[in-house]
Design a protein with these regions (language model features):
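N-terminal beta-strand motif that seeds the catalytic metal site of vicinal oxygen chelate
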Residues: 1-19, 76-83, 129-158, 201-204, ...
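An N-terminus-focused feature that recognizes amino-terminal "leader" regions
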Residues: 1-9, 15-47, 54-57
């Protein structure tokens, strides 16, 4: 059973530069920062409602995250689900023939963690984590609303996440999209043709506790954006490669 989206990982060139946007402009509280030597990163977790945002700075160009940065630039890297027993989850998935990168959990910034191979989840790199300590939800001006995933076969991709992790489908008004509930957040699987042909993680959506205060902060900082009545879209150049939507409302 997956309890929630624990975090979404974002590769950045420098943590200090990313803090200037995610912590100082958006107001996401910094929970912890540490060097994770076996992953070749310096990482930080910031609170976003029941979920978190993980920023990943490579320690060198030859590390996996360093190669990702050189190949793709800054942007979305992985998706992490919280499970009550990461060892049991990895064992179960491995026994079912699911490709995994870790058959046993190891230490990570999120607790005891393990990764599945991207081929297991339609090209999305998925991490499973069991936090080593229970933390209450940190107050934050933004809550993670959903992660958007592009797919050439929406039904198949949604079915994989349902089969592997037991997520339930959220009813939508027809169409070719599929939405899955994960804790209080959602995954939205959309046709790749609707998102520039991108297959994999495409965009993050947050809901603001005080939408007017948030838009004022973006305006003061001179952040390039598209303002709407109930949503603001931040240009990826300002949000370290992430298509970022911030809404006034939790639904739809």
């Amino acid at each position: 059973m997956m309890r929630r989206i624990h975090h979404v990982g974002i590769v950045v060139k420098r943590l200090t530069d990313a803090y200037a946007f995610y912590r100082d402009v958006l107001g996401l509280p910094l929970l912890r920062e540490a060097e994770v030597a076996d992953q070749g990163v310096r990482a930080a977790l910031l609170a976003a409602g029941e979920s978190e945002v993980e920023l990943l700075e490579p320690l060198g160009a030859a590390t996996p995250v360093g190669r990702f940065l050189a190949r793709r630039g800054e942007g979305l890297h992985h998706l992490c689900f919280e499970t009550p027993d990461v060892a049991a989850s990895l064992t179960d998935l491995h026994a079912r023939g699911v490709p995994v990168l870790d058959t046993q959990p190891r230490a990570g910034l999120a607790g005891r963690i393990g990764f599945l191979h991207p081929s297991a989840c339609s090209g999305v790199l998925v991490e499973l984590a069991t936090p080593t300590a229970s933390h209450g939800e940190e107050p934050s001006p933004l809550r993670l609303k959903r992660l958007v995933i592009g797919s050439e076969d929406v039904r198949a991709t949604a079915g994989i996440f349902q089969s592997l992790f037991g997520f339930t489908e959220v009813a939508m008004n027809g169409g070719s999209r599929k939405m899955l509930a994960v804790g209080r957040g959602t995954l939205l699987v959309v046709p790749a043709r609707e998102v520039g042909g991108i297959a994999g993680m495409v965009a993050l959506s947050f809901v603001a506790e005080d939408f007017l205060a948030l838009t004022a902060a973006l305006r003061r900082a001179g952040i390039p954006r598209l303002d709407g009545t109930g949503e603001v879209t931040v240009e990826p150049a300002a949000s370290h490669g992430v298509y970022l939507h911030i809404s006034r409302y939790m639904f739809p």
